Amino acid sequence: GSRIYGTVPIGIIIGEEAIITVSTQEVKLLNDFIKMRVKGFHTAKKTRIILQIMYKNATYYLFYLKQIDRLSESIQKELHKSMKNEELLQLLSLEKSLVYFTTSLKANEDEKEKMMRLDVIKQYSDDKDLLEDVIIENKQAIDMSQTYGNILNGTMGVVGSIISNNLNIVMKVLTSLTIILAIPTIVASFMGMNVPVPLADNPLGFWTIILITIVITAAFTRFMLKKKL
């Protein structure tokens, strides 16, 4: 089925003696800190905690962006075999996910810049490298999200063109078949008129008319095939 990768907003409240994080649901990112899975994590260093949250957040974005890219490649391979609605809906879901990712990452970039300008956030020389890593990781995530989004958008456009082209081909074939099948009907209707018609008294007239009908139908079919109609 279709799968959408979403984002969850996290609020960070900076107090005199504590940092409080708020989210609408349980977040794996924060659990990494709670379970002490983050290297160099110290609750006494507020600035570092904020930077570490931002860095960890960017790495998670990169991780899921790579997942989206792999899933997109897999779906596109399936589309080469047979174009089903399920695969198209999956691509649409991934495209929506990338829109959410790009929007959230850009918002994070803006918030990071605002946060670093606040007087309440003390900046230490030891955290300079970590801040640079945060900037690099977040920028890389934004670039990846936009690139994958553009590729997926282009893919959806190509798929739409292929579907439209296939529909036109089917309509052409059906129209051609309708015209070809109409030829015997027209001949039969003409010969069935209550007026004198050629070959009416000929004992081989019926078979002659059948042969003429077949020849006309075959000639018209060949003409349409030659013109690729």
Model-derived features with residue positions:
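Long amphipathic alpha-helical coiled-coil segments
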Residues: M115-K128, G154-S164
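Alpha-helical membrane-protein architecture signal
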Residues: I50, E87-Q90, D127, M156, ...
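A generic membrane alpha-helix/interface feature
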Residues: I34-K35, F41, D127, P203, ...
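Peripheral, non-transmembrane regulatory/ligand-interaction domains of membrane transport proteins
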Residues: G1-L118, Q123-Y124, D133, E137-Q140, ...
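Hydrophobic alpha-helical transmembrane segments and their immediately adjacent juxtamembrane loops
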Residues: K139-L229
